[in-house]
């Protein structure tokens, strides 16, 4: 009985690993020029304060990921994630977070 559970969880883990490696993530996409401009502005605004720069870049990264499913999150979503805002492109529809969002909405 214990071996059956071990085999079951091994197969389950293997399925999870395969799905994670095959799915397209936001981090896998090339960064758009408009996002890179926002990063440069954040660097300029932060000056020599590294903690402020880290926080600013983290906010930009999180907003980019969150804008993929909600274009009305911030006014600059179309600049942070042009793949998905104002309209979802085929690349956007392949992203794991977008697919999960659409599945939760019942649109997929």
Swiss-Prot record:
Its main location: secreted. GO terms for cellular component: extracellular region. One of its GO terms (molecular function) is toxin activity. Contains 3 disulfide bonds. Residues 1-24 form the signal peptide. Expressed by the venom gland. It comes from the Eukaryota. It is found in: Secreted. Keywords: Disulfide bond, Secreted, Signal, Toxin. The keyword Disulfide bond applies. The keyword Cytoplasm does not apply. Belongs to the scoloptoxin-10 family. This is U-scoloptoxin(10)-Sm1a. It comes from Scolopendra morsitans (Tanzanian blue ringleg centipede). The lineage of its organism: Eukaryota, Metazoa, Ecdysozoa, Arthropoda, Myriapoda.
């Amino acid at each position: 009985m214990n071996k059956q559970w071990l085999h079951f969880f091994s197969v389950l883990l293997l399925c999870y690993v395969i799905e994670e490696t095959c799915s397209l993530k936001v981090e896998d996409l090339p960064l758009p020029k408009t996002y890179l401009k926002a990063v440069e502005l954040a660097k300029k605004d932060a000056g020599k304060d590294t903690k402020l720069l880290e926080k600013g870049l983290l906010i930009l990264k999180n907003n980019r990921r969150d804008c993929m499913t909600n274009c009305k999150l911030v006014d600059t979503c179309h600049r942070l994630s042009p793949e998905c805002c104002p309209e979802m492109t085929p690349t956007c529809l392949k992203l794991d977070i977008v697919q999960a969002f659409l599945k939760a909405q019942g649109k997929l």
